[in-house]
């Protein structure tokens, strides 16, 4: 059982406090997921330690690192890793059945350029991810906390943006977000436009077309069924 951190922010996006609990949202692992966790964790799983990772040691090469926060069941992350063997992919997901499903798919796909963690992403960022080291950070379909009184719980806040900025490679690292909630998309733009050291790479300074390298996720398919649009947003670290 791992610590999970829930952050609360004020209206200015500043961190007020961290609420810690020891509930991992375990869920029930299927036999296939449990088998994948047991078999694949030694080669693809990374245990939480409060010390910085060495990407060359983790992956055995110097290829660019793409990190995804909250990969769900991992299908799109595995597909991206399979389609881009010249990159390394690192996924963080707090829901263990999702990690098991991701490992099962990765094993079936025969990919070797993927590593996963089952832990709170903020703690991993604070203690394990080296500064200036990520080519891309992916945040796809995070919890929109659609009620206005809950907007302060959204992960995309100024404090989080600064943490992301520190981890991206200077002058080239990309923060790629996607959401099927228009209000959250507008919130992302508003926060990131305030965040120092970032530049929106969209031609109109708003949203980018859906990138071909981002696979269709179940959340996106759900959004289409509900009549929602999907918004992709990319910011580049420029300082």
Swiss-Prot record:
Substrate binds at residues 147, 180, 217-220. It is an enzyme of class 2 (transferase). GO terms for cellular component: tRNA methyltransferase complex. S-adenosyl-L-methionine binds at residues 68, 93, 120, 143. It comes from the Bacteria. PROSITE patterns: SAM_MT_TRMB. Keywords: Methyltransferase, S-adenosyl-L-methionine, Transferase, tRNA processing. Coiled coil: none annotated. Pathway: tRNA modification; N(7)-methylguanine-tRNA biosynthesis. GO terms for molecular function: tRNA (guanine(46)-N7)-methyltransferase activity. Disulfide bonds: none annotated. Its EC number is 2.1.1.33. It catalyses: guanosine(46) in tRNA + S-adenosyl-L-methionine = N(7)-methylguanosine(46) in tRNA + S-adenosyl-L-homocysteine. The active site is at 143. NCBIfam families: tRNA (guanosine(46)-N7)-methyltransferase TrmB. Catalyzes the formation of N(7)-methylguanine at position 46 (m7G46) in tRNA. Belongs to the class I-like SAM-binding methyltransferase superfamily. TrmB family. This is tRNA (guanine-N(7)-)-methyltransferase. It comes from Vibrio parahaemolyticus serotype O3:K6 (strain RIMD 2210633). The lineage of its organism: Bacteria, Pseudomonadati, Pseudomonadota, Gammaproteobacteria, Vibrionales. The gene is trmB.
């Amino acid at each position: 059982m791992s610590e999970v951190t829930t952050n609360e922010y004020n209206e200015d996006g500043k961190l007020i406090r961290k609420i810690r609990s020891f509930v991992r949202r375990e869920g029930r692992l299927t036999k296939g997921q449990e088998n994948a966790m047991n078999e694949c964790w030694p080669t693809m799983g990374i245990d939480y330690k409060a010390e910085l990772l060495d990407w060359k040691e983790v992956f055995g090469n110097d290829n660019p690192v793409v990190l995804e926060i909250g990969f769900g069941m991992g299908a799109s992350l595995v597909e991206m890793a399979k389609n881009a063997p010249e990159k390394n992919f690192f996924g963080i997901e707090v829901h263990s059945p999702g990690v098991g499903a991701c490992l099962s798919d990765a094993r079936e796909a025969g990919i070797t350029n993927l590593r996963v963690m089952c832990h709170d992403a903020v703690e991993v960022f604070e203690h394990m991810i080296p500064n200036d080291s990520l080519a891309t950070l992916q945040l796809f379909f995070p919890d929109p906390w659609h009620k206005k009184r809950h907007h302060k719980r959204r992960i995309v806040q100024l404090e989080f943006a600064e943490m992301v900025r520190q981890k991206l490679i200077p002058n080239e690292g990309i923060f790629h977000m996607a959401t099927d909630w228009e209000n959250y998309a507008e919130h992302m733009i508003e926060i990131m436009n305030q965040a120092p050291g970032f530049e929106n790479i969209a031609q109109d300074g708003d949203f980018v077309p859906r990138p071909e390298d981002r696979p269709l996720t179940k959340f996106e398919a759900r959004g289409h069924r509900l009549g929602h649009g999907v918004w992709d947003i990319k910011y580049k670290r420029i300082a």
